[in-house]
A protein has these predicted regions:
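Accessory DNA-binding and partner-docking regions appended to nucleic-acid-acting proteins
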Residues: 2-6, 362-666
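Helicase motor core with emphasis on the C-terminal RecA-like subdomain
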Residues: 2-13, 17-21, 25-37, 41-47, ...
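N-terminal functional modules and adjacent low-complexity/disordered segments of proteins
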Residues: 63-65, 289, 608, 640
Length: 666
């Protein structure tokens, strides 16, 4: 630990003369040993709130971050300032991971960054138990809360992990937390009200504009942006869209007008995305047209424009995305080209996540069957369970969390179902490195993991049975510990896959029908909340009161003060304050759905579904198909390749369901 004060560390290590608003309060509380939450506006310097204390705390600071991009940007910053920090992630080879673990165990490493999913890894948890940890940092902590806009069920387990690894305190970081989310976060980690530090969301350099979307939206964008893209003085710009195909179309239209724009979305391979991001960060490419896949962790100070070509997904998303503009403090513009035409697509995304009632029944039947076994253990391989129940991965995770909350199941542990190994020394030489009972144990391992060419698959049941016959402890835990030790020594390479979560069924005699109805009602309630979230966003953009003030009120920010020379409660630099409140144009009218050809559009899926499963699809599956919404069952059906897929993607999902009901009831 440094002998200097935090203020001196701020200057000597990070090169800053003064703390920014809220930072010193957070750092002081963390160094005093308090669990703390920092609710800072995007770009307000949340990361320093853990980076600086990490240098003063005696042991490791463990940072849980939702995205690899977030880790990489922060690691680059820390490396430039000489801070011993590293990550463990899925892109690394074994040697790199092993080196990071050794540095953490030795105390050399001050900061270790991981994804929340990494904590499900049995071997990684075993490693963490060998490391002393001073602080756990939860980045994007709003993911903890079901009231948040980006709820991630795995985050709910973080309080348990804090207890399991005996971590004395936590620091929660987020830019987008409403009062309900903050209360939820505080409760989960027992954070005192005085240890919640909020900086406020008002940024005086951001001009918030809302413009009604014109019929030719591309030309509207070109006319607005082109004067800012003169050669040699291009204004760095992010343009957000909803769909990948829109990103490609808009980027192409801008390029045709001489604006060097590139599309960025999840449909591009990772190398291409990294190259585009690098060009934007360096200033070689001034304009990015992106889905929300772009921007997390981006720390580019001179972004002059953030444009929402389509509606954002929520007020929280909007706040986070506009927060990427003007981090250098200079004037920047946030333009929303708003119309109701994109609302149906966003609403359909919400409906697409609601599981089938039959899928919930199937899920509960599996749990009930496991509850009837003597050990009441239920092993879950998420991909397989998603396929078997036809429930998407995220809603399925949420259902499992709900079942925990209902006291039906409880997570016990997770393990990699399959291990394989490759020797770097002769197996006989490996045995020869040990004596007595240990040598017999290693001989048992070698004899019971046959090698096919190069790799051998570990069969834990076979090893256990062989151990019982020879009166040798060959339990799964002991075998894994031994194999990891051999790998650490460089004697073999060990690989694991097929993460399996093990739950205990606490209440095996529940009523399947009653619980299924309750869970389905909860899913529908969540659906209504998300639809209301979209309506709240529309209300913001159509507001006749100051947009900046409305944003502050949404996040419970009582610190907003009107700038000098403006009316009370007005920012003076938004559309409303300029005297231009808007009424969002309605979506273009569509032909009556009653005139649509049911046979033409629905028959391809009906026929393939009947051939594959022996029965026609239900109305929910047909509606998903016609609206272009994916389901696990569509993968084996290759539904995306069928005529009719997404033919109604611009129509409201409930309308399509109602239209289908008229045919399916006949």
């Amino acid at each position: 630990m440094p002998s200097t004060s935090p203020q001196q560390t701020l200057k000597d290590v990070f090169g800053f003369d003064d703390f920014r608003g809220g930072q010193q309060a957070v750092v002081s509380r963390v160094l005093d040993g308090h669990s703390t939450a920092a609710i800072f506006a995007t770009g307000a310097g949340k990361s320093l709130c853990y980076q600086l204390p990490a240098l003063h705390l005696p042991h490791l600071t463990l940072v849980v971050s939702p995205l690899l991009a977030l880790m990489q940007d922060q690691l680059s910053f820390l490396a430039r300032h000489g801070v011993a920090a590293a990550s463990i992630d899925s892109t690394q080879d074994r040697e790199t991971t092993r080196d990071v673990m050794e540095r953490a165990k030795s105390g050399e490493l001050k900061i270790l960054m991981i994804s929340v999913e990494r904590l499900k890894n049995e071997r990684f948890r075993h490693f963490l138990r060998q490391v002393r940890i001073s602080l756990m940092v939860v980045d994007e902590a709003h993911c903890l809360s079901e009231w948040g806009h980006n709820f991630r069920p795995d985050y709910l387990k973080l309080p348990d992990y804090q207890h399991d690894f005996a971590i004395p305190q936590v620091l929660l970081l987020t830019a987008t937390a409403t009062p309900a989310v903050i209360a939820d976060m505080r409760e989960k980690f027992a954070i005192a009200p005085d240890n919640v530090i909020t900086t406020g969301f008002y940024r005086s350099n951001l001009e918030l504009l809302v413009a009604p979307a014109m019929e030719d939206r591309q030309q509207q964008l070109i006319d607005w942006l082109k004067p800012q893209m003169l050669p040699g003085s291009e204004a760095p710009t992010i343009i957000y869209v909803t769909l990948q195909q829109t990103a490609e179309q808009v980027a192409k239209a801008l390029a045709a007008q001489g604006i060097a724009a590139q599309a960025y979305h999840a449909g591009l391979d990772s190398e291409r995305r990294d190259a585009i991001q690098g060009q934007f960060m360096r200033g070689d490419s001034p304009c990015i047209v992106a889905t929300i896949a772009f921007g997390m962790g981006i720390d580019k100070g001179n972004i002059r424009n953030v444009v929402h070509y389509d509606l954002p997904k929520s007020i929280e998303n909007y706040s986070q995305e506009i927060g990427r503009a003007g981090r250098d403090g200079l004037p920047s513009t946030c333009l929303t080209m708003a119309g109701r035409d994109g609302l149906r697509v966003l609403e359909n995304f919400v409906y697409g996540d609601t599981p089938e009632y039959a899928g919930i029944i199937r899920l509960l039947e599996e749990i009930a069957a496991a509850g009837g076994q003597p050990d009441r253990q239920w092993e879950v391989l998420l991909f397989t369970l998603s396929r078997d129940t036809n429930i998407r991965s995220l809603p399925l995770k949420t259902l499992l969390v709900r079942l925990e909350m209902h006291g039906i199941i409880a997570p016990r542990f997770a393990f990699l179902a399959e291990y394989r190994l490759r020797y770097h020394i002769e197996p006989s030489e490996l045995v020869g490195r040990f004596e007595g009972e240990r040598a017999a144990f290693v001989r048992l391992i070698v004899d019971n993991i046959p090698i096919a060419r190069t790799w051998g698959t570990v069969d834990f049941d076979r090893l256990h049975n062989a151990g019982q016959a020879q009166h040798i402890d060959a339990s799964r835990a002991r075998v894994i510990t031994a194999l990891e030790y051999f790998q650490d020594k460089g004697w073999l390479t060990l690989e694991g896959k097929r993460m399996t979560d093990v739950y205990e069924v606490l209440q095996p005699n529940f009523s399947i029908e009653a619980l299924a109805s309750q869970l389905f009602d909860e899913c529908r309630h969540r659906e209504r909340i998300e639809i209301e979230r979209l309506q709240a966003m529309l209300a913001l953009f159509e507001s006749e009161s100051c947009l900046t003030r409305r944003l502050a009120e949404h996040f419970g920010d009582s610190t907003f003060d009107a700038p000098p020379d403006t009316e009370q409660g007005r920012c003076g630099h938004c559309s409303v304050c300029y005297g231009h409140p808007v009424r969002l144009p309605d979506a273009p009218p569509l032909a009556a759905l009653s005139d649509a050809d049911f046979v033409r559009y629905a028959t391809p899926l009906i026929e393939r579904h009947a051939h594959q499963f022996g029965q026609p699809p239900n109305a929910q599956r047909l509606a998903h198909f016609l609206c272009g919404l994916t389901m696990p069952v569509f993968t084996p059906l290759k539904a995306r390749s069928l005529d009719g897929f997404a033919v109604f993607e611009q129509r409201a999902y409930p309308e399509v369901r109602e239209w289908l009901a008229g045919y399916l009831e006949c």
